[in-house]
Amino acid sequence: MEEKLREYAHLIVSVGLNLQKGQTLILSSPVECAPFARLCASAAYDLGAGEVVLNWTDDYITRERFLRAQDAAFETPRAWRRAFFTDYANEGAAYLRIDAEDPETLLGVSPARLVAAQRTSSAERETFDRLQMANGFPWCVAGAPIAAWARKVFPDRSEGDAVAALWDAILKTVRVTGDGNAEARWREHIALLTARKEKLNALRFKSLHYTNSLGTDLTIALPDDHLWAAGNSETPAGVGFVANLPTEEIFTAPLRTGINGTVCAALPLVNNGSIIEDIRFTVREGRIVEAKASRGEDVLNAAISVDDGARYFGEVALVPYDSPIRSSGLLFYNTLYDENASCHLAFGEAYPECIAGGERMTREELDAHGLNHSLTHVDFMVGTADLSITGTTHDGRELPVFRSGNFAL
């Protein structure tokens, strides 16, 4: 297992971040993942990192803070936190987040407090988030197990067995087998995603129509100059990186006011430390006018109330139902993995790279091209075995994009 973990750490730094010699790496990790964070730091130095800067998190202390701290703690942006994120982002440092959290860390926390905390955090990270969404620096999110998360995924196993099983599952999603060829497999995978992306870009769809047996009946208009993206992103300096390990998606941005109908989530969503189930949105002219859920509805409504843009959509992503992650049969209770098992949408901020020349546009120019703006970006999964997506071109042709949950192009 140690060799597999070293290979995974190297994959993250070399393919995920494409770390350059002399570049600073900001590594954000839960304290429970310290052993793996150390492997990532060593891999970074092996590739010539100038410095590795650690930013530790802890679910227990996070929950204690949300339950017991005074209101001012969630309402006052801190200059030192703003400086930490802004200074390194402006320097072009690479950013790695090891994604591992208890899906129910913040269960029972007041939704109003969650919204206040997100607004304050967004104020502290404004420059960082803007540059990240525009691929201003290499960034990558990759997972590692912690006990509470593993127990949720494998509730019938002992804690140790659950953690081991989650490690095995994670390594399979990122194509790490221990043979030393994970990087080569990823180059092939990125080439496949790129080919599909180029086919979609050549078709220049005007809109997409989603239907399935859950009740989804949604039409999504796309900006005239939209671009599909997949797998490999690129900084303004031309440095390629893979923002999510794993990734199976091809994505673009919708026209902000061009979505109408009903969409139903196919999988639970973990958001702000709570689980939300059976999401159902009613959408008119791009805006979510009604949000329902069988569990966590208060958390869901808080999430779409962060700002006005949170009630509009920022991402349309295509993932085949027979993707390796969905085929594993596991529900990860973690968006990094579950979004790569299913077609998904996101409410909130759109990625500038999804419009021609978007990374160089001002906020006003992005608005004029129909891209949504928000402090938040939350993916939720809509793909099912019977999902049908029909694309309409600008000359009126209707083409099957998805049939029975998989690509039909």
Regions found by a protein language model. Give the residues of each.
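Short solvent-exposed loop/turn micro-motifs enriched in small/polar/acidic residues
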Residues: 10, 201-203, 272-274, 309, ...
